[in-house]
């Protein structure tokens, strides 16, 4: 089964109005990341940490998925509908599996209609119990400290991967990329490459087997991303690259 792997970063949600970690303004400029996103001292800063993530959930609840989120949600239909028609004419075309891996902790992909998103760095609308690992959804509400309903532990944590904390979904990500082949495509959107070195990951994957096509869409050139890894690059806001990306994907998967 051919695969399209969509790997996204903060630039995807920036056009919805969410401040990114490296923006000069917004919440991140008002708080020290090493105080509100540090696994080694988050318990010492318990109230501050939850105050910060309460504000982030409040911010998230005020924005909507943008056109790129909605386009990504529609990709299974866009790419598979012509292939179904070809199959009916006995020109066999396997359905395309679309896999979403994101560094974002927001739920805008899900709200746009994407299911089974792999969130590498956690999910803002959820809380986790560090003791029993019970996870529960609190939406966009403010978290009021209380004991875990599952094991009664008293220090519940935002379901966010902090600095110096293990990120278990990275194993899944590396496994997905390592299995790609010449019939597969990777679409990278809105990432600087500073946290997850996506170009190195792709280069390593291709040391085993060539990936069919690789597309990059960023607002501008990022030194941490090797342009040579990609077959097509669009430097423009994500919502302005939709038509061109759709054309590239259709040419690869359908033509």
UniProtKB/Swiss-Prot annotation:
Comment text on domains: 2 residues (Tyr-53 and Arg-56) present in a large hydrophobic pocket are probably involved in substrate specificity. They are important for desuccinylation activity, but dispensable for deacetylation activity.
Recorded GO MF terms: histone deacetylase activity, NAD-dependent; metal ion binding; NAD+ binding; protein-malonyllysine demalonylase activity; protein-succinyllysine desuccinylase activity
Enzyme Commission identifier(s): 2.3.1.286
Localization, UniProt: Cytoplasm
InterPro entries: DHS-like_NAD/FAD-binding_dom, NAD-dep_sirtuin_deacylases, Sirtuin, Sirtuin_cat_small_dom_sf, Sirtuin_class_III, Ssirtuin_cat_dom
Binding site for Zn(2+): 129, 132, 148, 151
Protein name: NAD-dependent protein deacylase
Organism: Helicobacter hepaticus (strain ATCC 51449 / 3B1)
TM spans (from-to): none
Cofactor(s) demanded: Zn(2+)
PROSITE patterns: SIRTUIN (PS50305)
Catalyses which reaction(s): N(6)-acetyl-L-lysyl-[protein] + NAD(+) + H2O = 2''-O-acetyl-ADP-D-ribose + nicotinamide + L-lysyl-[protein]; N(6)-succinyl-L-lysyl-[protein] + NAD(+) + H2O = 2''-O-succinyl-ADP-D-ribose + nicotinamide + L-lysyl-[protein]
């Amino acid at each position: 089964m051919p695969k399209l792997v969509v790997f996204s970063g903060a630039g995807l949600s920036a056009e919805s109005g969410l401040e990114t970690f490296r923006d000069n303004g917004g919440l991140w400029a008002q708080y020290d990341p090493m105080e509100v996103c540090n696994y080694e001292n988050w318990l010492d800063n318990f109230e501050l940490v939850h105050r910060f993530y309460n504000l982030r959930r409040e911010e998230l609840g005020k924005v909507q998925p943008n056109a790129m989120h909605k386009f990504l949600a529609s990709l299974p239909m866009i790419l598979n509908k012509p292939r179904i028609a070809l199959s009916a004419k006995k020109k066999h075309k396997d359905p395309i599996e679309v896999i979403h891996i994101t560094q974002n902790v927001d739920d805008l992909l899900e709200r746009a209609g994407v299911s089974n998103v792999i969130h590498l760095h956690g999910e803002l609308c959820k809380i986790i119990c560090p003791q029993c690992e019970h996870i529960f959804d609190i939406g966009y509400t403010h978290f009021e400290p209380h004991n875990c309903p599952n094991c009664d532990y008293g220090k519940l944590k935002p379901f966010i991967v902090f600095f110096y904390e293990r990120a278990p979904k990275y194993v899944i990500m590396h496994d997905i990329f390592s299995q790609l082949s010449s019939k597969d495509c990777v679409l990278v959107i809105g990432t600087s490459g500073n946290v997850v070195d996506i170009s190195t990951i792709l280069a390593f994957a291709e040391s085993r087997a060539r990936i069919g096509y690789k597309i990059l869409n960023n607002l501008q050139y990022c030194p941490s991303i090797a342009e040579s890894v990609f077959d097509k690059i669009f430097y423009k806001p994500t919502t302005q690259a939709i038509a061109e990306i759709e054309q590239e994907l259709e040419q690869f998967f359908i033509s």
